[in-house]
Structure formats: structure tokens, C-alpha cells
Amino acid sequence: MGTDDVAKSEKIREGFQINWLILRDADTGKILWQENKDFSCPDVEHEARVPIKILDLRAVSREINFSTVEAMENFRLDQKVLFKGRIMEEWFFEMGWVSPNTTNTWQSTIEAAPESQMMPAKVLNGNVTIETSFFDGETLISKSVVRLYYI
């Protein structure tokens, strides 16, 4: 990463924050989990306690509410689901242009893996982390890690 990229990354990161996250049953719209916390902070491993029934759903709708001071040309995120440090799944989401000094809500639908590939909650519990890298184009803004616990 060049000096200009580092400066751009730091400038965007300073004015970027996650305000809240909501996970819903994509079929019914029912809220399964929500948290008013800045999950974009890179210096800590975050924790999320989600209902075990989320593992039985066909698809989950994720809403991210975020604020940014800086404009972003091509806001996107890459997400890796890791089990004991090994990648199980990887997803790529692209939002595109984000205006400066705005608060935005970004909704995405995530479909479940085939049932034959699912592991039981007792095996997954505490062993799954979601690593999310936030980008503006190719410039990394922030990277966060959330450890999942099923309740």
C-alpha cells in the first residue's frame, strides 16, 4: 500500500463507524438479533450471541447501518467465515458510491450452505469467527473479527 493509500485509508477510517447491525429471517422479516455497537473497530475481537435457530434458516437478511464523513467511490466488504481459523465460506458484497457526511443502511441477503455441509451448533459455538474487511475500492478501511456464540 502506497503512502497515498495509507493516508486515504486513515482519513476514511477516522470518519467511519458502524452504528448498528440487525440479522433477520429473510423469509419472514422477523428480527433474530440486533446490536448497537461499532463492529468496525479493528483492535478488538468482538463477540456476538445469536439465536441457535439462525442455523436452521434458508437465508438471513443483514442490515448494516453506518456513518461516514468521507465520500467513498466503491464501498464494499469481504467476509470470511472461519472455523477454528480455517476458511469455511467467503462472501463479497459491493455497495458502490457513498456520499460524504451521511448515515446509510445497507441490506444484504446471505443464503445458508446446503444442509449436508452444516455442522451442529455445539461444534460451531465459540469456534466460528467472521472476519470482515471494509474497503473503498482496493483501499482497506478497516478489518474486524466477530466470534459467534449460539444461544
Swiss-Prot record:
Its main location: nucleus. Coiled coil: none annotated. GO terms for biological process: sensory perception of light stimulus. It comes from the Eukaryota. It is found in: Nucleus; Cytoplasm. Gene3D superfamilies: GMP phosphodiesterase, delta subunit (2.70.50.40). GO terms for cellular component: cytoplasm; nucleus. Signal peptide: none annotated. Keywords: cGMP, Cytoplasm, Nucleus. Interacts with Pde6. Belongs to the PDE6D/unc-119 family. This is Probable cGMP 3',5'-cyclic phosphodiesterase subunit delta.
